[in-house]
Amino acid sequence: MQYHDQSLQTLKLGKKTEYISTYDRTLLQAVPRKLNRDDLGISTKQPFSFGADIWTAYEISWLNLKGVPQVAIADVEIDYQSENLIESKSFKLYLNSFNQSQFENLQQVEQILQQDLIKCAKGQVKVRLNSLQNYAQQPIATLQGECIDEQDIEILCYEFDPNLLENCTNKQWVEEKLVSHLLKSNCLITNQPDWGTVQIHYIGNQINREKLLRYLISFRQHNEFHEQCVERIFCDLMKFAQPEKLSVYARYTRRGGLDINPFRSNFEPIPLNQRLARQ
């Protein structure tokens, strides 16, 4: 993908912007998934059959019909088959536009959010607004699996290198869930760091954990959006490890009141949106 692609030049991300506090759906901006998928060779057919970009929006507020502020937390699922992903700063600005606008009730806001996101993503989107009372009952979760981070290895290079996965399997057939908290990449536009925890669930020849960790650490200076990184990890593992079944799930830390948690799989459904310790 060309980072200077014209479709990225119009994004508000990385630019000084005005904060609008009256509802305006035109603030939402899309990024074509095709940009990254062309580079991965999966624009026509994706190697995953289940997936979504799972967002949590913590800063949602509007006025009721009497002018009293209301607040909620949103769970949003944007289907992996949608034509576009949603650019995060535009999503933040769009949500801010609800702040001084009046709506009848939570259900009306939820419906408007869903309609607008569907139009921007050009695909299926699910939205659920949660009261703070309900959300407070959600515990801090952990991604199931064996953590691969405590290996006694030396890292000298932090440039992205998929070839670190070359010859990464042995002949032992296993089902494993492996977890790393060391995923870090950078925003495609602003170069700001994106911190994440990634879970890899697979059935196939056993993956060498040292090679996998070196590969994940190689994202440390790589510039891509969250969703693109997860699809790249999925494609690289399918190429080098060739598992029979594979899921890749990353949960990223919050920025601007939003966290993004992409999930891609060729065999299991989308997980519940459960926040981790860093979220």
UniProtKB/Swiss-Prot annotation:
Substrate binds at I86, E87, S88, H226, E227. NADPH binds at S88, K89, R255, G256. Pathway: tRNA modification; tRNA-queuosine biosynthesis. One of its GO terms (molecular function) is preQ1 synthase activity. It holds the Pfam family QueF_N. InterPro entries: GTP-CH-I_C/QueF (IPR043133), NADPH_dep_7-cyano-7-deazaG_red (IPR050084), QueF (IPR029500), QueF_N (IPR029139), QueF_type2 (IPR016428). It is found in: Cytoplasm. It catalyses: 7-aminomethyl-7-carbaguanine + 2 NADP(+) = 7-cyano-7-deazaguanine + 2 NADPH + 3 H(+). The active site is at C187 (thioimide intermediate), D194 (proton donor). It comes from the Bacteria. Keywords: Cytoplasm, NADP, Oxidoreductase, Queuosine biosynthesis. Catalyzes the NADPH-dependent reduction of 7-cyano-7-deazaguanine (preQ0) to 7-aminomethyl-7-deazaguanine (preQ1). Homodimer. This is NADPH-dependent 7-cyano-7-deazaguanine reductase. The gene is queF.
